[in-house]
Amino acid sequence: MFKYIGDIVKGTGTQLRSMVMVFGHGFRKRDTLQYPEEQVYLPPRYRGRIVLTRDPDGEERCVACNLCAVACPVGCISLQKAETEDGRWYPDFFRINFSRCIFCGLCEEACPTTAIQLTPDFEMAEFKRQDLVYEKEDLLISGPGKNPDYNFYRVAGMAIGGKPKGSAQNEAEPINVKSLLP
């Protein structure tokens, strides 16, 4: 008999607690957003759409080193290297299959030139999977992205045809090793 009364009291308490919780939520700020009208807050380091950036000079930053494709755990990046007359490398084609991409950011970390950057854009829905394969023309943006002053060829000091050694940023003049001998 006491067990029966205890079960009734316990059940009534559970229902009252649930009703108080529902009533309390009626006066709180809503968690649901009306999406297109109200934008979702994204943290600063949110990893969304991948873009290819340009140098401050307007040239492509990508040097087709293939490190992004090697670092990608799902293999959604493919590219092929080509070379200009002055010896500068660039990707002949650069392709990302966003239907396979998991937006892990490893390609951005592996890129030595900061050409690949992840933006906070996440609206990439398509009706056909073929439309989720982005080519270089779709990925290139007009600006330098997160690092506006960085230029790989000036910082790295790589030899470019017609440019003397030691003329790059942070690069010293070549040392004549034979002059150091006694």
From Swiss-Prot:
Main location: membrane
Free-text comment on the cofactor: Binds 2 [4Fe-4S] clusters per subunit.
Membrane topology: Peripheral membrane protein
Requisite cofactors: [4Fe-4S] cluster
Catalytic activity: a quinone + NADH + 5 H(+)(in) = a quinol + NAD(+) + 4 H(+)(out)
UniProt KW keywords: 4Fe-4S, Cell inner membrane, Cell membrane, Iron, Iron-sulfur, Membrane, Metal-binding, NAD, Quinone, Repeat, Translocase, Ubiquinone
Residues where [4Fe-4S] cluster 1 binds: 62, 65, 68, 111
GO molecular function term, any single one: NADH:ubiquinone reductase (non-electrogenic) activity
Superkingdom of the source species: Bacteria
GO annotation terms (biological process): aerobic respiration
Residues noted as binding [4Fe-4S] cluster 2 in the record, renumbered to the chain: 72, 101, 104, 107
SUPFAM superfamilies tied to this protein: 4Fe-4S ferredoxins (SSF54862)
Record GO cellular component, one term: plasma membrane
Compartment(s): Cell inner membrane
Listed EC numbers: 7.1.1.-
Stretches assigned to the 4Fe-4S ferredoxin-type domain: 52-82, 92-121
Disulfide pattern: none
NCBIfam families: NuoI (TIGR01971), PRK05888.1-1 (NF004536)
Assembly description: NDH-1 is composed of 13 different subunits. Subunits NuoA, H, J, K, L, M, N constitute the membrane sector of the complex.
Function recorded in the entry: NDH-1 shuttles electrons from NADH, via FMN and iron-sulfur (Fe-S) centers, to quinones in the respiratory chain. The immediate electron acceptor for the enzyme in this species is believed to be ubiquinone. Couples the redox reaction to proton translocation (for every two electrons transferred, four hydrogen ions are translocated across the cytoplasmic membrane), and thus conserves the redox energy in a proton gradient.
Similarity field: Belongs to the complex I 23 kDa subunit family.
UniProt-recorded name of the protein: NADH-quinone oxidoreductase subunit I
Annotated organism of origin: Pseudomonas syringae pv. syringae (strain B728a)
